[in-house]
Amino acid sequence: MRRKLLFLGCNYDQIPYLESIDKQNWKIVGADLNQNAPGRHLCDKFHSVGYDDLAGLIEVGVREKFTKDDMVFTAAAQFAQKGAAHFASNFKISFPSEESIDLCLDKTKYYDWFSKNGVPIPKTWNIKDIDELKKCLKLSKSEFFYLKSDFSKNPHYVYRFNSLKVPWEGFFWGRDRYLREFYVLQEEFQGVSLRINVYSDRFNVFDFLTGSKTNIHHKEIISLGVIDTLRDFISQQKMQDWLIKFDIILNDDSYVVLDIGM
């Protein structure tokens, strides 16, 4: 009997992953809110349920008789990893914990973790409203700042501004999937913006602005212990089998970590 694999998100971007998994003799159970999802034809079974419908995903698992010997996978939006982790936990499937996924999605959580575990970050405040923003800006002598919502994914609610010309009317203060509770206010850190992909015992560095792979910063990255620090985070979250992306800013003698991608 073929092992089952719950595949979350069956849009066009996910089709190459579906095709690859289909060649490995899995019984693919697809899940997508769109009943006419483009990848539906590659699934052995299909359920019209969104990756953020946690109860609905569990119902699918029960109906399809998932067990700990089966799998769950998603190549959809990062938010889909929450659904995958919740599903895996319910059926005792090997997968990073829901707590670890929540940590990687919520800036307030991972900046707090970084701060407590010696991972360098810019000067940071959690902001709930415009009054708190005004108060924190007065505490800093920095010229430039970034204001980012707790679940922001660029360009959603990411603002860069000069402290002498704050765009007060331009900030969104409602609440939605990208801003759930806090904004994160950070002093701008000067340096080169890089993305580091860490996987297994390897890593690759990319220029954040151009997306081009680069090796010119390896010496500084190694000497500052950046990779060891990032691998320690990955290990503690039990994500050693994943490719994890980190956005950092690097200068001659220091660095800060800004973001995590799964």
Question: What does each model-found stretch correspond to?
Answer:
Residues 28-29, 121-122, 183:
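Hydrophobic anchor at the start of a short beta-strand
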Residues 89-166:
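A conserved helix-loop-beta module that forms one wall/lid of the active-site cleft
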Residues 8, 31, 147, 186, ...:
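Active-site flanking residues adjacent to catalytic metal/cofactor-binding acidic residues
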Residues 1-99:
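ATP-binding N-terminal substructure of ATP-dependent carboxylate-amine bond-forming enzymes
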